[in-house]
């Protein structure tokens, strides 16, 4: 395992940001941490990258203890932070050259490495322009280039597409997948975009209030609990007849609407409607990771976002 944690915990005065987390990530995996702001995703990445020290528990990255061997951990990883961290007053090439020096990339191959990553993220033509002239997407691509230029075994990506438009987000992920394949890297990313995790990750962990709620491949999670999702509104609310149906895997009631998880809903829809009584409407769709999140947390991820992040929860204590 290239990443391993045992009982990893981070506490602040009034709140537990990460709660006894056990995690194992294999070499070459693209692993996603999925959850709302304040769930503990950034806290976990910060500890694995040795930026924060755990309150208790242990963790190893590339076989190195994050507390006892932080320098070895840092030398073996790359990271793209949630907030921009490139120097606006330098050119793209100068930012990469400075990173080469900091990570001790041999002088003989520095130029080659810079040219390689600039080509990979399609920034060759803008490499000698100041970063303050770059678009948001270009800056993100530059940060990706910087993160992998020293050939890390693990690449940490903390909300790498946060705030970007959908087209730019798609391009960024194309680069990430290509980088992972070309460099044979393990990628650990955080996101609250469900579709990103579903399309990109070999496995995901849903994290909420500092705990891992469930962990598996996206498809396995959907298959285990969802199937199709039937959303309906009864004219006369009465859920007991529906609750007795053996083909209804899960049922959530929210704001007068029922959300039912049913495998092969088209086969059961006619029978289902004989048990619902009169309805205002019914909708059938394929299940998504948002439905998985709803199943395990009782909230949709956008509702969890609206509750506020970590420090908002601290202030409520």
Please identify what each model-predicted range represents.
Residues 97, 101, 108-126:
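Conserved ABC ATPase "signature" region
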Residues 130-134:
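Conserved ABC ATPase signature
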Residues 151:
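Conserved catalytic motifs of ABC-family nucleotide-binding domains
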Residues 155-158:
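Catalytic Walker B motif of ABC-type/P-loop ATPase nucleotide-binding domains
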Residues 174-263:
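ABC transporter nucleotide-binding domain
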């Amino acid at each position: 395992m290239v990443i391993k944690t045992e009982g990893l915990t981070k506490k602040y005065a009034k709140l537990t940001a990460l709660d006894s987390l056990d995690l194992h990530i294999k070499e070459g995996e693209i692993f996603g941490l999925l959850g709302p702001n304040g769930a503990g995703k950034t806290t976990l990445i910060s500890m694995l990258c040795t930026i924060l020290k755990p309150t208790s528990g242990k963790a190893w990255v590339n076989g190195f203890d994050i507390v006892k061997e932080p320098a070895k951990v840092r030398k073996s990883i790359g990271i793209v932070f949630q907030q921009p961290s490139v120097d606006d007053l330098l050119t793209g090439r100068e930012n990469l050259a400075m990173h080469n020096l900091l990570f001790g990339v041999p002088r003989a191959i520095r130029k080659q490495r810079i040219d390689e990553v600039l080509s990979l993220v399609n920034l060759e033509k803008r490499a000698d322009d100041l970063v303050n002239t770059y678009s948001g997407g270009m800056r993100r691509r530059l940060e990706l280039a910087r993160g992998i230029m020293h050939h890390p075994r693990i690449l940490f990506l903390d909300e790498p597409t946060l705030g970007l438009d959908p087209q730019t987000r798609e391009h960024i992920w194309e680069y990430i997948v290509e980088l992972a394949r070309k460099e044979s890297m393990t990628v650990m990313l955080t996101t609250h975009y469900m579709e990103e995790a579903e399309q990109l990750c070999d496995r995901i962990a849903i994290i909420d209030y500092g705990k891992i709620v469930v962990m598996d491949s996206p498809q396995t999670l959907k298959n285990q609990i969802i199937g199709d999702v039937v959303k309906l509104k009864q004219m006369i609310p009465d859920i007991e007849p529906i609750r007795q149906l053996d083909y209804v895997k899960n049922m959530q009631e929210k704001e007068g609407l029922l959300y039912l998880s049913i495998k092969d809903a088209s086969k059961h829809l006619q029978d289902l409607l004989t048990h619902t009584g009169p309805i205002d409407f019914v909708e059938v769709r394929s299940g998504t990771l948002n439905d998985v999140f709803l199943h395990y947390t009782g909230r949709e991820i956008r509702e969890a976002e609206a509750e506020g992040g970590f420090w908002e929860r601290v202030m409520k204590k």
